């Protein structure tokens, strides 16, 4: 208890001039100059009565609000009013609501006296910062309003806009909006109202500039004036969109101004779900009727609701402050330097207030600005207004998709639209009998069918007509546009349905729907088909040089194999190692013929009966087999492509190749999107291509796709066009092909005038057609009727005789050669047989032929020669006996027994000649027979005992018997002395 008493004494002596708070007094400055009033006075009374009837803050203190009228926005008058307020000992000052300059003066004086100031109107621009004190504002900050307008523009995809300002400070007030346009490099034109306040000249300028989005930064009365003048100029149609920054948008009287399709947007802060809102509106309505019986009540003004919330905010802060300390009021004067000691504490509690009022959630940040609130976005109509979205103070926007814009079926139902188009296969074409038809029936194509689907879906009618100048649309130096774009800008058409490319430059002046087809720029060129596969096309996988080197490799391998086999001792072998009576005679299987045949068998992957024995010959065989493996695999891999693909001869393969040469001309459609793409491109290759196309004479630009196709087929010309058209014309003409890939990615859309009310309806309908697969069905209908198949749809086909007929020719030639050789061998053999048998050649040939054509006989007996001379075996044996050994080889001796007398080694004798006749010359040595060391010893013994018969000859009968044929393909057929 002593402590509490001491505290009260300290407070009493510390504030001797403060009076104990018996009533909570506030001062409200009203600047309402309207006839019927905005209801601010009534709102203050309602707030006072509601608070006094529910709570007492502080204990036994009632709320009192002193009202002061401000006749005009004057600094002197405002200062005089404040000098009247200060001696009354108020805890807060409210208002004014519509005089920013006066509100700034009030804030300055309250800051000097440390009395909280509650603002209920727009901020002054620029916003003054006070070092000692600050006020709090229930009105949205300029930054929030600017951000809300900017987000709405982005939500509706408005590329350009015009700003009408009532005061010069609007650029500072809407600083965030202006900064957004500067960053996006979009167009924002600013127009200032003059002192006459007549917006007609400004509206005419906006109409001439083809700007459809208009932002009005003014109070409610001036905004109403601008809209009324706009209605007189016919600028309130569906083409124009208005955004008002005033927060009194709900009370604007727009009867007779807005149309059914008008788009006028504004903001509202009212919390219609507040429990006291119906009573508040009813009370204001009754007051309005008492003061203004002749006019209709428009609704509650925002300033009245802000005054109501301001009283509650101050009471809430005082109640919280009173819990920690007792509050006392102090009369002040303008001429003194005294301050209210509790003002700073109350200001701190004001910043901490959290209250749900008629204007929504009330909270403040450290700067005293309102935060954590919402702005309802309303759209005006004849029936009133409807909410289409909400903007939150955390800089987010939520649009209501169900109420955004007008219902589709109600917008286009039973309306007739003028549709401009351009002839372009297969999008829009004339029917073959179009002269006998009229209206829309004259045309057909993909776009015509799509337009018919849209009309059935949205229930509208249309009238097709061709664009007057036959162009898609490009900007002129004077700023105007040609083609379909120009007709949309000048309102000559409602829609443009064709192969209409969506570009950023066109989007600035017209609107587009969502793309109904995605594509890119491609290169179309005429190709010369390569020669068709001939009878000898199986030789195409390898060049002639490769075939020549393969032949040389074959000959080289054969020679190396022959030499290696002759030099290596491991290739000489005994053909009969198991017969002990046989002599040690070594044979070599690699004769010259076998050496040539062995690589052929390996190359043909068939092998042969000849197997290498020595390491050297195996090495040669291995590398040859590896060589043939790679060659055959490569040949097989390339053969199918060379026999099935008819190669095309294309001199360039990409846009870079096209830009690097000058032999082939290239160009685009004049005044089309492709031309604009190259004109605006910053890529070096495309810039070079544009410089070439622009400077080339005669011009490389064409007026239509058909002209470009004809130029491609008749000259060295590459046509740059959209990939979908490229695909269509390649299906019609097989001599056309696409070079490289796509140069960009874009889409075709339906064009509309800027701000057209049909944009969203048509976009949604296109999306619905895509989801139902109707657009894909239409594309297949008009693209799959060509004579040439799609390149990616090639399938394997059976090879004809024109592909592989040459191998049959080779086979037939080989068979003919084989038969010819067989006939020659047959003739040669029968001729020799006839001489040995001493019969006529014809008789011998007839007998051999009879045996050869006998299908059942597979063997025959060898005929013996007639008697009368020594047998061939005896002659051979005699020749062997007369052979001598020289350098490890067997040679036949000469007449005098000297081998050297006959000019060196000769071959073995085949026939000793007639009986009693002279001996023939000594033959050359048998190069494939080698005599071992044992034979050398026998030869020496035979030379020492010349008269003794050699061991192993047997009886004379055996000596005279015909020799046995030796097995083996290369073994010698002659008998040696051992046999």
Swiss-Prot record:
Cytoplasmic-side positions: 566-622, 825-979
Residue spans crossing the bilayer: 545-565, 623-643, 804-824
Location of this chain's protein in the cell: Cell membrane; Postsynaptic cell membrane; Presynaptic cell membrane
Extracellular side: 15-544, 644-803
Membrane topology qualifier: Multi-pass membrane protein
Location of region: Disordered: 856-875, 890-925, 942-979
Residue ranges with Basic residues bias: 856-867
Gly residues: compositionally biased ranges: 894-903
SMART domains named among the record's database cross-references: Lig_chan-Glu_bd, PBPe
Bias type Pro residues, positions: 912-923
Glycosylation sites: 219, 271, 285, 322, 372, 394, 400, 407, 414, 478, 735
SUPFAM superfamilies the UniProt entry points to: Periplasmic binding protein-like I, Periplasmic binding protein-like II
Tissue: High expression in the cerebral cortex, pyriform cortex, caudate-putamen, hippocampal complex, medial habenulata and granule cell layer of the cerebellum. Weak expression in globus pallidus, thalamus, colliculi and the reticular thalamic nucleus. Expressed at high levels in the trigeminal ganglion neurons.
Family under the similarity heading: Belongs to the glutamate-gated ion channel (TC 1.A.10.1) family. GRIK5 subfamily.
Role noted for this protein: Ionotropic glutamate receptor that functions as a cation-permeable ligand-gated ion channel, gated by L-glutamate and the glutamatergic agonist kainic acid. Cannot form functional channels on its own and produces channel activity only in heteromeric assembly with GRIK1, GRIK2 and GRIK3 subunits.
Cross-referenced PANTHER family: IONOTROPIC GLUTAMATE RECEPTOR (PTHR18966)
Subunit structure: Homotetramer. Heterotetramer with GRIK2. Can form functional heteromeric receptors with GRIK1, GRIK2 and GRIK3.
Name the UniProt record assigns to this protein: Glutamate receptor ionotropic, kainate 5
Source organism of the structure: Rattus norvegicus (Rat)
Name of the gene encoding the protein in the UniProt record: Grik5
């Amino acid at each position: 208890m002593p402590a509490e008493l001491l505290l009260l004494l300290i407070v009493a002596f510390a504030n001797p001039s403060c009076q104990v708070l018996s009533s909570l007094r506030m001062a409200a400055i009203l600047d309402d100059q309207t006839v019927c009033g905005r209801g601010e006075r009534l709102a203050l009374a309602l707030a006072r009565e509601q608070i006094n009837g529910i709570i007492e803050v502080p204990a036994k203190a009632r709320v009192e609000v002193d009202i002061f009228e401000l006749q005009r926005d004057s600094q002197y008058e405002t200062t005089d009013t404040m000098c009247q307020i200060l001696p009354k000992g108020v805890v807060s000052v409210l208002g004014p609501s519509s005089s920013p300059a006066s509100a700034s003066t009030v804030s300055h004086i309250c800051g000097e006296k440390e009395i909280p100031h509650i603002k209920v109107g727009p901020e002054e621009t620029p916003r003054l910062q006070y070092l000692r004190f600050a006020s709090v504002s229930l009105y949205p900050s300029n930054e929030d309003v600017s951000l809300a307008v900017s987000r709405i523009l982005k939500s509706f995809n408005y590329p350009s806009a015009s700003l009408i300002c009532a005061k010069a400070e609007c650029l500072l007030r809407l600083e965030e909006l202006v900064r957004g346009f500067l960053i996006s490099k979009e167009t924002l034109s600013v127009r200032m109202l003059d002192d006459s306040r007549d917006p007609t000249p400004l509206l005419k300028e906006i109409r001439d500039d083809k700007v459809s989005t208009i932002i009005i930064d003014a109070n409610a009365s001036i905004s109403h004036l601008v809209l009324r003048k706009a209605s007189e100029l016919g600028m309130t149609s569906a083409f124009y969109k208005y955004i008002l920054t005033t927060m009194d948008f709900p009370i604007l009287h727009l009867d007779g101004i807005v149309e059914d399709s008008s788009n006028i947007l504004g903001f509202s802060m009212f919390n219609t779900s507040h429990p006291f809102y119906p009573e508040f509106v009813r009370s204001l309505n009754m007051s309005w009727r008492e003061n203004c019986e002749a006019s209709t009540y428009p609704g509650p003004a925002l300033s009245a609701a802000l005054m109501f919330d301001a009283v509650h905010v101050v009471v809430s802060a005082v109640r919280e402050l009173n819990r920690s300390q007792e509050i006392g009021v102090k009369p002040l004067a303008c001429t003194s330097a005294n301050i209210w000691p509790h003002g700073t504490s109350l200001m701190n509690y004001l910043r901490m207030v959290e209250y749900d009022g008629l204007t929504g959630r009330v909270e403040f940040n450290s700067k005293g600005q309102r935060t954590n609130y919402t702005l309802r976005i309303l759209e005006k109509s004849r029936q009133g207004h409807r909410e289409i979205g909400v903007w939150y103070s955390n800089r987010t926007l939520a649009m209501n998709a169900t109420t955004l814009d007008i219902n589709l079926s109600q917008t286009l139902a039973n309306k007739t639209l003028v549709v401009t188009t351009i002839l372009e296969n297969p999008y829009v074409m004339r029917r073959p009998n179009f002269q006998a038809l009229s209206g829309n029936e004259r045309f057909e194509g993909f776009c015509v069918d799509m337009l018919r689907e849209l009309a059935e879906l949205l229930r509208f009618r249309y009238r097709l007509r061709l664009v007057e100048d036959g162009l898609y649309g490009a900007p002129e130096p004077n700023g105007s546009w040609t083609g379909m774009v120009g007709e949309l800008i000048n309102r000559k058409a409602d829609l443009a349905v064709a192969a209409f490319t969506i570009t950023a430059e066109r989007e600035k002046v017209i609107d587009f729907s969502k793309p109904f087809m995605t594509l890119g720029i491609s290169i179309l060129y005429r190709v010369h088909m390569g020669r068709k596969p001939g009878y000898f096309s199986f030789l195409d996988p390898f060049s002639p040089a490769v075939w020549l080197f393969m032949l040389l490799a074959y000959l080289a391998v054969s020679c190396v194999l022959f030499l290696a086999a002759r030099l290596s001792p491991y290739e000489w072998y005994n053909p009969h190692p198991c017969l002990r009576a046989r002599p040690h005679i070594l044979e070599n299987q690699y004769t010259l013929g076998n050496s040539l045949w062995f690589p052929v068998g390996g190359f043909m992957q068939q092998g042969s009966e000849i197997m290498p024995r020595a390491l050297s010959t195996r090495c040669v065989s291995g590398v040859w087999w590896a060589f043939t493996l790679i060659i055959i695999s490569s040949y097989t891999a390339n053969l199918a492509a060379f026999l099935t693909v008819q190669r095309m001869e294309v001199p360039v393969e990409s846009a870079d190749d096209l830009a690097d040469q000058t032999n082939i001309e290239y160009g685009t459609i004049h005044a089309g999107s492709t031309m604009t793409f190259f004109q605006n491109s910053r890529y070096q290759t495309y810039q070079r291509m544009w410089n070439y196309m622009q400077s080339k004479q005669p011009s490389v630009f064409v007026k239509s796709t058909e002209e470009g196709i004809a130029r491609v087929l008749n000259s060295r010309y590459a046509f740059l066009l959209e990939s979908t058209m490229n695909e269509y014309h390649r299906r019609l003409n097989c001599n056309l092909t696409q070079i490289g890939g796509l140069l960009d990615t874009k889409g075709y859309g339906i064009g509309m005038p800027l701000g057209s009310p049909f944009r969203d309806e048509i976009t949604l309908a296109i999306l619905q057609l895509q989801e139902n697969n109707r657009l894909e069905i239409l594309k297949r209908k008009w693209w799959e009727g060509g004579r040439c198949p799609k390149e990616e749809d090639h399938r394997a086909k059976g090879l004809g005789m024109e592909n592989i007929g040459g191998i049959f020719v080779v086979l037939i030639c080989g068979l003919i050669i084989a038969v010819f050789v067989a006939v020659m061998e047959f003739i040669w053999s029968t001729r020799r047989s006839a001489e040995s048998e001493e019969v006529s050649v014809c008789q011998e040939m007839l007998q051999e032929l009879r045996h050869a054509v006998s299908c059942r006989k597979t063997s025959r007996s060898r005929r013996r020669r007639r008697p009368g001379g020594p047998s061939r075996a005896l002659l051979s044996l005699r020749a062997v006996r007369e052979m001598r050994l020289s350098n490890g080889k067997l040679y036949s001796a000469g007449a005098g027994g000297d081998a050297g007398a006959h000019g060196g080694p000769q071959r073995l004798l085949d026939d000793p000649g007639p009986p009693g006749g002279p001996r023939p010359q000594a033959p050359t040595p048998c190069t494939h027979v080698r005599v071992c060391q044992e034979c050398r010893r026998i030869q020496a013994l035979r030379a020492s005992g010349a008269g003794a018969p050699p061991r192993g000859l047997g009886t004379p009968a055996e000596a005279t018997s015909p020799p046995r044929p030796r097995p083996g393909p290369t073994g010698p057929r002659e008998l040696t002395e051992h046999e």
